[in-house]
Swiss-Prot record:
Its main location: nucleus. GO terms for biological process: cellular response to retinoic acid; regulation of DNA-templated transcription; regulation of transcription by RNA polymerase II; spermatogenesis. Keywords: DNA-binding, Isopeptide bond, Metal-binding, Nucleus, Repeat, Transcription, Transcription regulation, Ubl conjugation, Zinc, Zinc-finger. May be involved in transcriptional regulation. Involved in cell differentiation and/or proliferation. GO terms for molecular function: DNA binding; DNA-binding transcription factor activity; DNA-binding transcription factor activity, RNA polymerase II-specific; RNA polymerase II transcription regulatory region sequence-specific DNA binding; sequence-specific DNA binding; zinc ion binding. It comes from Homo sapiens. Residues 16-38 are annotated as: Disordered. Belongs to the krueppel C2H2-type zinc-finger protein family. This is Zinc finger protein 35. Residues 9-221 are annotated as: Globular domain.
Length: 527
């Protein structure tokens, strides 16, 4: 090796290298049991490791019998005979990638004698003068030896200095190996798989990113210590545990409301921004969530996905199916002695009989109000505590009862699952349908004791009775005027705000109430 070559190798910048190799005859080395063809293509070298021993198969160094130790590596591209499944020890086969501690340490292929394609070995690299055309190898042994001779020592010291500067600048460890399209014997694969299991998934023969074998099998290795629920990813477990700890790290800057997940915050912020990215292609109605759009689109498609198992009748909504299935429940062995109404469960009969007896065993400690069921008491107590655990994701409105939330959400989805069999009019609540059907039947069960006027709904009777008793519970904060109905107060407040939501389509005149708009329409009819 000439002094110019040594200096070029020592001062060479770090970068990918290609070393040309001439065709050579097969050679035998001590410790070689057998040989087979090794096909290695596109071997790339990229990351820092310590003290790789390499050798030059040149005549000058071969005569001296020297082994040169460098903290560098090369790119090999060779096709030749190599020992099969045998350790080379300290011997070096020119042009062949031998088993090394680099491969062993980083969990990649260290088996010789296999046909390998696209092997990317990420170790440090330097440039070699291609004029020499001398094949370099990575030896089995990784050693640090004092360089022999002053010239070689100076060259190695410069190479080490460049390497240390590179490591300090990058501050990264790129030691990883990717093996693609690797054809290995089954015995070797089994050995490597055992290593993978022992390492807990950190060691993997697979190409690309490291994968945990437990998650590949559909298992859920991350378990909540509170409730025992399992997750396939640790990140999902962290989010889940916030349910138990009450942690809500994602806070809205507009209103201060906090959420467990960032996705919930994004949906919530659309209330303030007014953004509705999910638009119905049929009618143009927009929604803040894709789930609400899906429910809405059933109105247009009339898709009936909920089928009855008894008669195969299909419905668009689960609530419609649940109501229909009551038709098939014929066995009602628990009958009320007072009114003859039957029930499928004795507990339902006991609760029903309290209507006749007037028994209300569940009383509120704050106000003394009593209820026939404990569930009703729990909901009532929230009126004292102010607790509203059920929140609408669309607009953020909260409710003390889950059933109230379900009814409210139909405002956003436009769902009206209760249809009148007489006229086909649909309603979002069953109670509204029952009241409506009394128009057809003429049933007016709620009668005023003062004047004898009857009504289809108890709330209508309550409002009417305020005429007799003079009660006006709804007061305007601006002027102090009081009203018998909340709707009357809402209309009145528009006189202060100037809001006029009802607009005439013909002339553009706007009004504070629908009744005023209807009165205005009559002027156009006269014309």
């Amino acid at each position: 090796m000439t002094a110019e070559l040594r200096e070029a190798m020592a001062l060479a910048p770090w970068g990918p290298v290609k070393v040309k190799k001439e065709e050579e005859e097969e050679e035998n080395f001590p410790g070689q049991a057998s040989s087979q063809q090794v096909h290695s293509e596109n071997i790339k070298v990229w990351a820092p490791v310590q003290g790789l021993q390499t050798g030059l198969d040149g005549s000058e160094e071969e005569e001296k019998g020297q082994n040169i130790s460098w903290d560098m590596a090369v790119v090999l591209k060779a096709t030749q005979e190599a020992p099969a499944a045998s350790t080379l020890g300290s011997y070096s086969l020119p042009g062949t990638l031998a088993k090394s501690e680099i491969l062993e340490t980083h969990g990649t292929m260290n088996f010789l004698g296999a046909e390998t394609k696209n092997l990317q070995l990420l170790v440090p690299k330097t440039e070699i003068c291609e004029e020499a055309e001398k094949p370099l190898i990575i030896s089995e042994r990784i050693q640090k030896a004092d360089p022999q001779g002053p010239e070689l020592g100076e060259a190695c010291e410069k190479g080490n200095m460049l390497k240390r500067q590179r490591i300090k600048r990058e501050k990264k460890d790129f030691r990883q190996v990717i093996v693609n399209d690797c054809h290995l014997p089954e015995s070797f694969k089994e050995e490597e798989n055992q290593k993978c299991k022992k390492s807990g998934g950190k060691y993997s023969l697979n190409s690309g990113a490291v994968k945990n074998p437990k998650t590949q099998l559909g298992q859920k290795p991350f378990t909540c210590s509170v409730c025992g629920k399992g997750f396939s990813q640790s990140a999902n477990l962290v989010v889940h545990q916030r349910i138990h700890t009450g942690e809500k790290p994602f806070e809205c800057h507009e209103c201060g409301k906090a959420f467990i997940q960032s996705a919930n915050l994004v949906v919530h912020q659309r209330i303030h921004t007014g953004q509705k990215p999910y638009v119905c292609s049929k009618c143009g109605k927009a929604f803040t969530q894709s789930s609400n759009l899906t429910v809405h689109q059933k109105i247009h498609s009339l898709e009936k996905t909920f089928k009855c198992n008894e008669c195969e009748k299909a419905f668009s909504y689960s609530s419609q199916l649940a109501r229909h299935q009551k038709v098939h429940i014929t066995e009602k062995c628990y009958e009320c002695n007072e009114c003859g109404k039957t029930f499928t469960r004795s507990s339902n009969l006991i609760v029903h009989q309290r209507i006749h007896t007037g028994e209300k065993p569940f009383a509120c400690n704050d106000c003394g109000k009593a209820f026939t069921q404990s569930a009703n008491l729990i909901v009532h107590q929230r009126s004292h505590t102010g607790e509203k655990p059920y929140e609408c994701k669309e607009c953020g409105k909260a409710f003390s009862c889950f059933s109230h939330l379900i009814v409210h959400q139909r405002i956003h989805t436009a769902e009206k699952p209760y249809d009148c069999s007489e006229c086909g009019k649909a309603f979002s609540q069953l109670s509204c349908l029952i009241v409506h059907q009394r128009i057809h039947s003429g049933d007016l069960p709620y009668v005023c004791n003062e004047c004898g006027k009857a009504f289809t709904c108890s709330s209508y009777l309550l409002i009417h009775q305020r005429i007799h008793n003079g009660e006006k519970p709804y007061t305007c904060n601006e002027c102090g005027k009081a009203f018998r109905q909340r709707s009357s107060l809402t209309v009145h407040q528009r006189t202060h705000t100037g809001e006029k939501p009802y607009e005439c389509e013909k002339c553009g005149a706007a009004f504070i109430s629908n009744s005023h708009l209807m009165r205005h329409h009559r002027t156009h009819l006269v014309e």
